[in-house]
Amino acid sequence: MAASELLKSRVENLRDYELVVILTTDTPKEKVEAILEGISKTIAEKDGSFTEVNHWGKRKLAYLIGRYGEGYYVFIKMKAKPSSIRKINADLRISEQVIRHMAINMDEE
């Protein structure tokens, strides 16, 4: 197998990711669910899925982020392709309700 074929096959494989999203505390529950549904649809388009979703709830931030001292935390474990993660990051970056987010690839050693 050529190196380029190997790289392409590795890039397109599903990988395990953990995603933490911190939302503003005044975000309505319906909007939280809409954001999670949007993430789910994005990864489902490329055969991915959530394996676990935990609402950690309202917590104090370690430091102020903008004007926010508290945030509503959501922790997600999922199987997704890297291209899905790039789209999720772009979507979350422009959302007004998202204070901060981070996706981590759990497959890397």
Swiss-Prot record:
One function term, GO molecular function aspect: structural constituent of ribosome
InterPro entries, per database record: Ribosomal_bS6, Ribosomal_bS6_sf, Ribosomal_S6_plastid/chlpt, Transl_elong_EF1B/ribsomal_bS6
Keyword Ribonucleoprotein in record: yes
GO biological process assignments: translation
HAMAP family attached to this UniProt entry: Ribosomal_bS6
NCBIfam families (alphabetical): S6
Protein family: Belongs to the bacterial ribosomal protein bS6 family.
Role, per record: Binds together with bS18 to 16S ribosomal RNA.
Annotated protein name in UniProt: Small ribosomal subunit protein bS6
Gene (name only): rpsF
